[in-house]
Amino acid sequence: MTFLGYPPAEHLLGDLGMAAEITSETTARVRTRATPQIASADGGVRAGVLATLVDVVGGAIAARVLRPDWMATADLALEVVGPVPGPWVEARGSLLRRGRTTLVVEALVVGVDEDGNDLVVDGRAPDPVAWASMTFAVLPTQDASSGGRPSPELPTRWAFSGGGLDLPVLEALPVTVLDGPAGRLSIPARPYLHNSFGAVQGGVVALLAEAAGAEALGAAQGRDASDMVVTDLQIAYLALAKVGPIVSSARVLATGTDGRAGAVVELHDAGAGHRLTTVVNVTAVPAEHFDPTVV
C-alpha cells in the first residue's frame, strides 16, 4: 500500500516493510522489523534506519496537519541511547509546533512486538532507546483542491510492502566506498531511493552520512567501519539531491577517552555541479565501548 501515492512498488521503504498508523490529528507511529540486514555493530538497528523511521513518522504527521499544503524536511536530529534489538522497533511521533513557515515534530523510539505492543521486561515497559526531532519547511500549495481531505476516521493505518531486504541495507542502496579514511562514499540517485519530490529520500541521506562517518571515524582509530556504532546524527538538509551520484566527504573531530568521536560529513550532488545538499554531524563509538549509561 502507498500513502498519497508514495512510495512506488519497488522502493527501499517497501523493502523495509514499514507499518504506519495515524493515531490522532497530531500523533502517529511507524514500525519496522529489526533484521540482521539493518543491524549495526551493537546488534541493534542502525542509526540511519532509525532516522528513516522517524522521518517517515514525522512526514505522516506533517502531511495530515498541513494539507492541502506540503512540506520538506529541513533538519533532523537523532540521539540513540542504547541498542535497539527489536523484534520490532517503533517511532512514536507527536506535533510540537506548527508555525506559518515551519512545523516541528518529536519522536521517541521504542522496542515493540509485531502488533505494536510495548515489550515488558521485569514487569515494566522499557524506556525509549532513541529520541529525535524534525523541522519541516511548509510549502504552500498553489491549488487548494489538489491535496484532498484527510480521512476523518482515526486511527488510519497503512503499510509499505515490498520484497524485503536479502542483503545488508548499505549494499541494497548501494553504497560504494571510494576512500574510507576520507569518508568518501557514493550512492546513485535512483527511483528506488527517491522521495515524493524525485530526490534522494531523507532517511537514505542519513544512511549515507552514517556510513561515511563510520568509515572516517573507524579509520582514525585504526578500526574497521563495521566496528563503530553511530549514536548521534544532526542533519541539515540544504538542497534536493536529484541527479547523482551523491558523494560524501568527512572531517574528523576530536576523539574522547572512551573512543567516542565526531565528524562533520558533507554530501554533494556530483551530477549537479557538486552542489552541497546536506551537512551532518556524526558521533560514533567503538561497539565494545557503547555503554548506554554514558551516552
Located regions from the model:
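Terminal targeting signals and extreme-terminal segments of soluble enzymes
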Residues: 1-295
